[in-house]
Amino acid sequence: MNITILSKETIKPLAPTPHHHKYYKVSLLDQFAPSSYMPFIFFYPNKFADRDAAGILTQLKESLSQILTIYYPLAGRVKDTVYVECNDEGVEFIEAQANGSLSDFLKQPDIAALNNFLPRNGNGLEKGCSISPVAIKATVFECSGIVLGVCIFHKVVDAAAAGEFLQSWAKIGRGSKETVELPNFTSASSLFPPRESLSSKFVRDFDNFFFQGSKSFMRRFVFDATAITTLRTKATSEKVPNPSRVEALMEFVVQHLSTAFKTAKSETPETLMITHPVNLRKRIEPPLPDSTFGNVIWLAFAFYDCDPSETKIKPGDVVERVREAFAALDKESISELETDDAFTSLSELLESVYTNEKIKIYRFTSTCNMGFYDVDFGWGKPVWVAHMGNMVDYRCKQQIVFMETGHMSKDIELWLAAEEDELSVLEKNAEFLAYATPNPTIWLDSDGTN
């Protein structure tokens, strides 16, 4: 597959941002977010014999200009750790052409090629004094199938807010009569005021926690609904009789990844550290609306002390620790996040973890139930929403992402970034493969014509 860039242009808001909105104040939680782009890749087959690809690209750009008037911080530039300058500099929009058929690509998805659909490096450490919060790349196949690659800067929004933005853009794009809900730009920074300055040591420790210099390779696996039900049953315990889908999958993945690590490296870590971001919008009192802009998340930290004599983590052990970590983020602990004590504790934790080679970190996240399969611009919902390909320079190591597989589907995709020797062991593990299908075909709807 060859992709040729045809044009690059900057899409600016349809109307100028008012002067009193020139600076968007970030929150403390934004400051704690990774300095990287979140990648999302949407695949839209051609369902119409007379599809006008050029007209669709124009529609995308015009609707983007309209939504940027509402989501004006995304058309600005991240200038420092406290503010986004809402200067209407705009969003880069790249048009590209791919040879071949989209359906052929989806029959056997080339994970390593996915980065070609993105306008930026996904999940890489970004440094600079003027970072664009959003970048778009639209790639049209010869069959008029379209792939939309979106990169959104994590220090401005979390995945839930990104989903709200993309669904709102799609509503305008398809001419929906539904009202686009106005984003709430003030609640997050009011509840969690930013620190006017962050020490260089904290920034360094934070970057070292999330980003490491080794190359990570991406793999995609799919757990069908039957497999997930079985794994939930296996993960039950007296303390957690009803593990969620994500909790059960987290335990299963940690069980087999830790085994793969021990086999590949011939060593056993002393402790496993398992993290997962938690959406705080509904945990805050009173709850915040889904339209709350920014990062309104906090990491849940779970720890598992390894026993060298154990060949495998016992069923239910990881789920219990993860459930306790989630439960610890209650109203009281959330209210204390902006205190000096909490800041000091986080700083000490980050430093102790990244400097201790005996701690193995598994960083989980999930985009399930965030509406990414509802991003319909008028030519149907995407048949696939993908993550990204391999991570080359300063990428998040041991990144584990759960994603939905389609609209109304009960299956879950696992996107796993790890070192090649660990992945090689995992891909030969019959017990793991009994539940996880490696990179299956993406099936088009029955009326897909490409």
Curated annotation (Swiss-Prot):
- Listed GO MF terms: acyltransferase activity, transferring groups other than amino-acyl groups
Motif annotated as Nuclear localization signal, chain positions: 218-225
Which reaction is the catalytic activity of this chain?
A: rhazimol + acetyl-CoA = akuammiline + CoA + H(+)
> Pfam families given for it?
Transferase
Per the UniProt entry, the dependence of activity on temperature is: Optimum temperature is 22-47 degrees Celsius.
InterPro entries from the UniProt entry: CAT-like_dom_sf
Q: What pathway or pathways are given for this protein in its record? A: Alkaloid biosynthesis
Which keywords does UniProt give here?
Acyltransferase, Alkaloid metabolism, Cytoplasm, Nucleus, Transferase
Q: What class of enzyme is it?
A: transferase
Task: Report the EC number(s), separated by commas if there are several.
Answer: 2.3.1.322
Q: According to the record, how does pH govern the activity?
A: Optimum pH is 6-8.
Residues of the active site are H154 (proton acceptor), D376 (proton acceptor)
What binding partners and quaternary form does the record give?
Answer: Monomer.
Similarity-based family: Belongs to the plant acyltransferase family.
Q: What is the purpose of this protein? A: Acyltransferase involved in the biosynthesis of akuammilan monoterpene indole alkaloids (MIAs) natural products, components with various biological properties such as antidiabetic, antibacterial, anti-inflammatory, anticancer, and antimalarial activities. Catalyzes the conversion of rhazimol to akuammiline.
Q: What is this protein called?
A: Akuammiline synthase 2
